[in-house]
Design a protein with these regions (language model features):
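Predominantly extracellular/luminal regions of secreted and cell-surface proteins
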Residues: 2-6
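Short Trp-Ser/Thr-centered turn/loop motifs at beta-strand boundaries
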Residues: 13, 97-112, 143
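Residues that flank catalytic or metal-binding motifs in active/ligand-binding sites
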Residues: 63, 116, 134-136
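Short, surface-exposed beta-strand/strand-loop-strand elements in extracellular ectodomains
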Residues: 132-154
Length: 174
């Protein structure tokens, strides 16, 4: 079988914290939403689908959420459950961009070709100032299920990178 390459994610940059006293949370019929009355949350240089955002200074929703879909520049849905909470106009809730996840991609096992060696490569780029240095962990995950649920995924051993910016290119075989 010919070698192929799949790019799961292009370049990502850190989004500066977004704060506002108009940020609210709603839970309606299994749809979990974070929105504001005027503070821009999404769009160029802001949050996007699959970003991880950590909420602080809210009454009931201080947690990390995965952006599921962008509804508008002032509203997005999340994967995780939120507790309905209205903005009080004086408490400034902060949304901190803490990372991102990528879409899932089908591997050769899905196509009944469970042989061969796989390589994952990470390129960590420091753009020159301390506000964008990557300092964290990247994990490759896999599943043996042909129609996986969230619980079917596992970390692939030997492919986890914890970066301190001393080396910027990493490759792992599995």
């Amino acid at each position: 079988m010919a070698q192929t390459s799949t790019t799961l994610s292009g370049a990502k940059s850190h989004v500066v914290d977004i704060s506002g006293a108009d940020i609210s949370f709603t839970s309606t019929s299994g749809v979990y939403t974070i929105k504001s009355d005027g503070t821009v949350l999404t769009g160029a240089g802001k949050l996007a689908a699959l970003d991880l955002v950590t909420v602080t200074n809210s009454t009931n929703n201080n947690s990390t959420f995965t952006v599921k879909a962008v509804v508008s520049t002032t509203e997005f849905t999340v994967e995780e459950i939120v507790t309905t909470e209205t903005a009080d106009g004086s408490t400034s809730v902060t949304l901190d961009h803490t990372g991102f996840v990528t879409d899932k991609a089908k591997g050769d096992g899905y196509y009944s070709q469970p042989d061969g060696v796989h390589t994952v490569a990470y390129q960590i780029v420091n753009l020159g100032d301390s506000t964008d240095d990557f300092n964290g962990t990247i994990k490759m995950q896999g599943t043996l299920a042909t129609t996986p649920t969230e619980d079917d995924w596992f970390d692939i051993s030997g492919t986890t990178l914890t970066s301190d910016q001393s080396t910027t290119n990493h490759a792992y075989n599995f």
